[in-house]
Amino acid sequence: MIKKEEVYKIGLFNKPHGIHGELQFTFTDDIFDRVDCDYLICLLDGIFVPFFIEEYRFRSDSTALVKLEGIDTAERARMFTNVEVYFPVKHAEEAEDGELSWNFFVGFRMEDVRHGELGEVVEVDTATVNTLFVVEQEDGEELLVPAQEEFIVEINQEKKLITVELPEGLLNLEDLEED
């Protein structure tokens, strides 16, 4: 059985395309194209299920048409509408270019060297020019932290921990400090 910590979300299947079972795929990470891994993992009814990729072709920088093995009709493809798509962490770590997308870090905890625990990275916001980690604090409040290498001190993949050193004044961190 595939566990949540063994995968990370890379996108979403939208609606079927055509009559032969192709799916429109909106992705935030093109790792499936950069790494030798012939399957994607879908979250179906709370269970991570692998599906082999028969073929795919890009439509833009963030969309592709994907054909999965055994999904040969529009009717079968419809079952995948709005299904979240994940990629195995072990294969992402093998990327030849050494580049991991920011989305790889969703689920990691984040701490600041001066202020300690910030929270958990729950999302990556790419809606603006500056990519942001959306970090959920213990109290449920969200922090927006710039996803910039210059602020990252260390990434511990085993502990799923990102240590950052954020410039003073970047965030309102007074609320995080324990008195």
Curated annotation (Swiss-Prot):
Pfam families: PRC_RimM, RimM
Keyword Protein biosynthesis in annotation: no
Compartments, as annotated in UniProt: Cytoplasm
Presence of the UniProt keyword 4Fe-4S in the record: no
Domain PRC barrel residues, every copy: 97-170
Function according to Swiss-Prot or TrEMBL: An accessory protein needed during the final step in the assembly of 30S ribosomal subunit, possibly for assembly of the head region. Essential for efficient processing of 16S rRNA. May be needed both before and after RbfA during the maturation of 16S rRNA. It has affinity for free ribosomal 30S subunits but not for 70S ribosomes.
Domain notes per entry: The PRC barrel domain binds ribosomal protein uS19.
Protein name: Ribosome maturation factor RimM
